């Protein structure tokens, strides 16, 4: 009898720590299904909590958004950890209300490390300090970002030389990684307002700083980029690096109140 009770206790405890999404098993053919704010919270917890063996729980896992989420999401995915899986937005939109004015690396996704985020839109508002992006604050180490659209207002409270604020992406930084390859960003657009009194602001990407360079193509800004500072402000990429591979940037649509380079 005691053995049976022990068995059921172990089974219950294991079930308690398992991920509880709207469906799926996390494989490519059967991704975890994200349908509501509770699912986003579950993904946030999964991203910030290491597995039993100390590994990143989202590594090799697949997630798919099944519908628009109109209830504002106030949290972040990857606040303490980083996202290393594949997030397929399915062409849907997530409404955000992220207000973290004293925190760095703020966005729907904080850090995406060797992961992928694609086919997703966000709306609402995002407020942070340094490295603030509507969708991803900091993609790094071969992160793959494509088919992304930001409609949210993105604001940085920082006045630093590297506020790194972008409608879609805050700052691409991996200098400490040395030999790691840069991020790939393609088919991304911003329609939201981007503002800060600091430097390195862009409608799509605030700062692109990676020793090995990033690949950026087919990006456009249709929003307003505003700063009282006149340095490193641009419609699309606030601070591109010399070794970035940049192709097909739409600059004609940009509205600025400051000087810009790209």
What is the predicted role of each segment?
Residues 1-19, 140:
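Bacterial Sec-dependent N-terminal signal peptides
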Residues 19-255:
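Surface-exposed repetitive/solenoidal architectures
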Residues 256-262:
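Positively charged, low-complexity/disordered segments
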Residues 8-10, 14-15, 46, 68, ...:
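Low-complexity, intrinsically disordered/propeptide-like segments
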């Amino acid at each position: 009898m005691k053995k049976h009770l022990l068995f059921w206790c172990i089974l219950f405890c294991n079930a308690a720590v398992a991920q509880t999404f709207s469906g799926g098993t996390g494989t490519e053919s059967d991704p975890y299904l994200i349908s509501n704010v509770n699912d986003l919270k579950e993904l946030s917890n999964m991203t910030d909590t290491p597995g039993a063996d100390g590994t990143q729980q989202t590594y090799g896992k697949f997630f798919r958004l099944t519908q628009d989420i109109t209830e504002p999401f106030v949290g972040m995915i990857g606040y303490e950890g980083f996202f290393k899986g594949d997030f397929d937005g399915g062409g849907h939109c997530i409404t955000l209300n992220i207000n973290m004015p004293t925190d760095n690396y703020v966005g729907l996704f904080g850090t995406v490390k060797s992961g992928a985020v694609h086919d997703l839109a966000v709306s609402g508002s995002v407020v942070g300090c340094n490295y603030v992006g509507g969708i991803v604050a900091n993609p790094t180490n071969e992160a793959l970002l494509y088919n992304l659209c930001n409609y949210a207002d993105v604001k940085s409270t920082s006045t630093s030389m590297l506020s790194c604020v972008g409608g879609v992406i805050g700052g691409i930084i991996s200098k400490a990684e040395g030999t790691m390859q840069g991020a790939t960003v393609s088919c991304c657009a911003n329609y939201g307002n981007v503002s800060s009194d600091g430097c390195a602001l862009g409608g799509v990407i605030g700062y692109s700083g990676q020793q090995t360079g990033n690949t950026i193509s087919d990006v456009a800004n249709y929003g307003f980029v505003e700063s009282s500072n006149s340095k490193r402000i641009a419609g699309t990429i606030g601070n591109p690096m010399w070794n970035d591979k940049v192709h097909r940037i739409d600059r004609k649509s940009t509205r600025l109140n400051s000087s810009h380079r790209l």
